[in-house]
A protein has these predicted regions:
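Small/polar-rich, solvent-exposed N-terminal microdomains that initiate assembly or binding
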Residues: 1-42, 50
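Signature of extracytoplasmic/envelope-associated structural regions
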Residues: 20-21, 69, 96
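A generic structural micro-feature
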Residues: 29, 50-55, 89-93
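Oligomerization/assembly interface segments of phage tail-like spikes and tubes
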Residues: 54-65, 93-101
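Short, conserved charged micro-motifs
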Residues: 67-73
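Acidic-leaning, charged glycine-interspersed low-complexity segments
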Residues: 74-101
Length: 101
């Protein structure tokens, strides 16, 4: 199983800045554009009554004021990425993806 910190660095490379946040508390003041991600599931595959494969599922959200953000395109090309939805909140565009890592 790959580490979350490895995933974090890959997301930093996609974004091009360090504004990548893992489960940020509400008290943090984020800078944009940003990527926010959180763990959403840990599906297991079993064999002989043991877990033999475990891949963590993450919800990844690209947040940008630009509705045509190139970051969304780069995120969509991430291995295992699946686009979920787009919405606007507080004047910022949010594009959510599911990835397994």
């Amino acid at each position: 199983m790959a580490s979350r910190l490895e995933l974090h660095e890959k997301l930093v490379n996609i974004l091009g800045t360090r504004y990548v946040y893992f489960q940020p508390p509400e008290s943090i003041k984020m800078k944009y554009p940003a990527i926010v991600y959180e763990r959403s599931d840990i599906p297991n595959k079993f064999a002989n009554d043991n877990v033999y494969l475990q891949t963590i599922k993450y919800k990844v959200t690209v947040v940008d004021s630009d509705p045509d953000s190139e970051i969304v395109e780069r995120m969509s090309k991430f291995k295992t990425a699946r686009f979920e939805k787009h919405y606007v909140s507080d004047g910022l565009n949010h594009d959510t993806f599911t990835i397994y890592y």
